[in-house]
Amino acid sequence: MHPTWALGFGDEVWWSRLAQPDQHCWTDTGATTTWHELVPPKGDLDPTALACYGRLVRPQPQAPEQLWLRFVAGRPVSAVTIAFLAWCSTRLAAQGFTALLLIWDNASWHRSQAVQHWIRQHNQQVKRGAVGVRLVVCPLPSKSPWLNPIEPKWVHGKRAVSEPDRLLRADELEARVCAYYDCEREAHLVMPKKVA
């Protein structure tokens, strides 16, 4: 791979405050453990789940991979995807990269006309000297999430941050996720009101 290109695997994930992930644990012979879906108390204004964009960046084969996260105030949509791509592009350019080989699934917001148009415009602007990296999209085959190496990271992360005995607040869950992946907490990406 070219030394100024980065390989990036993208995905979105929901972090539930209520549902418990599949867990494996040791128990005494004959004993069982049961995980229950938690119930929020009346008046709880926190969302039941937090949407999050993730990018697993592999700069070079010998360099350590990086996992970047951005939580979303709302849900993944084209406009939020564009904001996330712009953030990733600026961040990679600051590290000296010139291109991102972006591998992701076929989510509707990845394939949308708005995202495709933005990527074309962005690449043209970068070619003319704007700050950022060129984005080369490499879609995964349909129904093939196991080909994306970020997927197992979500599974392990959900197990690691889960709390069996109490309901986590949304900000507490976000803090645990960022701590687990050793990521800085960034401002939430905001879903435009017109698509809400």
For the regions a protein language model found, what residue spans apply to each?
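Extended, low-complexity cationic-aromatic segments
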Residues: 1-87
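C-terminal anion-handling pockets and recognition modules
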Residues: 3-5, 134, 142-143, 147-196
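Short glycine-/polar-rich loops that comprise or flank the Walker A/P-loop
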Residues: 4-5, 48, 98, 132-136
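Acidic/histidine-rich, metal-coordinating catalytic segments
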Residues: 11, 97-111, 140, 148
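A short acidic (Asp/Glu
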Residues: 18-21, 111-116, 150
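RNase H-like polynucleotidyl transferase catalytic core
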Residues: 32-43, 122-152, 165-166
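Short, basic/hydrophobic alpha-helical segments
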Residues: 80-101
